[in-house]
Regions:
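Conserved catalytic-core segment of nucleotide-activated headgroup transferases in glycan assembly
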Residues: 21-23, 28, 166-275
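A charged, aromatic-enriched C-terminal amphipathic alpha-helix characteristic of glycosyltransferases
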Residues: 349-357, 367-398
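C-terminal alpha-helical cap of glycosyltransferases
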Residues: 368, 389-421
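N-terminal pre-catalytic "stem/leader" segment of glycosyltransferase-like enzymes
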Residues: 1-76, 225, 394-399, 419-421
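Acidic donor-binding loop of glycosyltransferase active sites
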Residues: 275-292, 303-306
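Donor nucleotide-sugar binding/catalytic pocket of nucleotide-sugar-dependent glycosyltransferases
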Residues: 120-171
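Extended catalytic core of nucleotide-activated donor transferases of GT-like folds
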Residues: 7-9, 48-133
Length: 421
């Protein structure tokens, strides 16, 4: 049986959020369409993020590496492009864009135009889908500046959540992650990149969380610690020192006798992260910013069934149940100039957590921890059963069956040999 040709352009071997999404997506695609499509991978860079996510010694990873091809010689039947949407190009007979888009309430026009170039698109959360669907811009003539029309979403868009691998993120009786240097028995943990923006203005609100944690527990005899798993762009001694300096600036702004913050720096395997989340000293997860999806929330919940403090805005609310988690107060505000970039445009808004609400939430979980355990277990069960990788595979099958038009695979015809006259 001849198969349709399928090429997936993505950062398959890159250590980054888009890299992780690419690997999960392609593995799911192989499960769903591997018998019908000849699936190949066009490996791409992702900014300055390092390579090396794939391991030759892992059979699934080796299969992905063997599917990597050089420059294409002909048009594929099916084309997937996992990247920022302004880079989308309709290369295949059917072209499908996969993107996280943005974490704000307005999509830049160039991303909308990219979505409209594809046959259909796949995003990670309902928040992102709604942002795309609700954004429109006036299209102006470059010379007269007169309105010529409207730029808005014209192509279908589907939601495929980033399912957690429950074979990797799961409950453990004992954790062998070494936290012996941490003296505190109660630690909050936060996981996320330290992104651009002044203190209190970064997308993930790490600086707001750090400052609120220090303020909540300063000058107290009994207090928890905060484990901060973060990085800027890569992993280096210089970058680590830069992060420590940033933390020190916040500490000096608070003053007093402050609780400890432990920087956990460097790349960890998923097995190591699972052991970290299951450690007895790690009691709760806190992250109060804006997410396209929010993989760390889901992975922590599935692994540990421990309490989560979060913002009530953006991608992670798809899977964080309002009844089972602690949501901080705040308001949706226009972006600060220090956080603006090509895709996070100045006209857009996102969630700004209220520092006092963060402090109150941290104190409540620390001082009344047993109160939050049952709901955390319910959230963990929901994460493992409703938002697993296997459920993601099922959802991908539904999306493809619904949206990919029928294409006939090329047939090989064997002609009979003719007699020579």
């Amino acid at each position: 049986m001849n198969k349709l040709t399928c090429v997936v352009s993505c950062p398959i071997d890159v250590i980054s959020g888009y890299g992780a999404r690419s690997r999960d997506f392609v593995k799911a695609l192989i499960k769903v369409k591997g018998e019908e499509w000849d699936i190949k991978i066009l490996s791409q860079r992702w900014g300055e993020c390092p390579y090396g996510a794939l391991d030759n010694n892992v059979p699934e990873d080796l299969d992905l590496l063997r599917r990597v091809i050089g420059p294409m010689e002909r048009q594929p039947d099916i084309w997937f492009q996992i990247t920022v949407a302004n880079e989308f190009q309709p290369v295949g007979k059917v072209s499908i864009g996969v993107s996280a888009l943005v974490e704000t309430n307005i999509l830049p026009a160039e991303l909308l135009e990219g979505l409209n170039r594809m046959t259909f698109n796949i995003v990670s959360s309902n928040f992102v889908k709604d942002t795309a669907a609700n954004t429109s811009f006036d299209k102006l003539d470059q010379n007269t500046k007169q309105k010529q029309g409207t730029v808005e979403l014209t192509k279908p868009i589907e939601v495929l959540f980033e399912g957690v691998d429950t074979n990797k993120y799961k409950r453990l009786e004992n954790s062998d992650f070494d936290l012996s240097e941490i003296k505190e028995e109660f630690c909050f943990i936060t996981v996320g990149h330290w992104l651009a923006g002044d203190v209190g203005e970064d997308r993930k609100q790490l600086t707001t969380l750090i400052k609120a944690f220090l303020s909540a527990f300063k000058d107290k005899k009994k207090r928890p610690a905060l484990i901060l798993k973060t990085s800027l762009a890569g992993f280096s001694i210089i970058e680590e020192e830069t992060i420590l300096d940033k933390i020190d600036v916040i500490r000096k702004s608070v003053g007093g006798d402050m609780p400890n913050i432990y920087l956990l720096y460097g790349e960890l395997t998923e097995e190591e992260m699972n052991h970290l989340y299951n450690h007895d000293k790690v009691k709760a997860f806190a992250l109060v910013g804006n997410e396209g999806f929010g993989r760390p929330y889901l992975e922590f919940s599935a692994a540990s069934s421990k309490p989560i403090i979060a913002s009530p805005f953006s991608g992670h609310v798809d899977f964080l149940n309002q009844e089972f988690n602690i949501f901080v107060a705040g308001r949706v505000e226009q972006l600060h100039p220090s956080a603006v970039n090509q895709f996070l445009i100045k006209e857009s808004s996102w969630f700004k957590a209220d520092p006092k609400s963060i402090e109150d939430s941290l104190k409540a979980v620390y001082e009344n921890y047993p109160k939050y355990i049952d709901n955390a277990k319910r959230q963990g069960h929901q994460s493992r059963t409703q938002f697993s990788y296997d459920k993601m595979v099922e959802r991908l099958a539904e999306i493809l069956n619904k949206n990919v038009p029928k294409i006939s695979a090329p047939q090989t015809i064997t002609l009979p040999k003719l007699k020579t006259l």
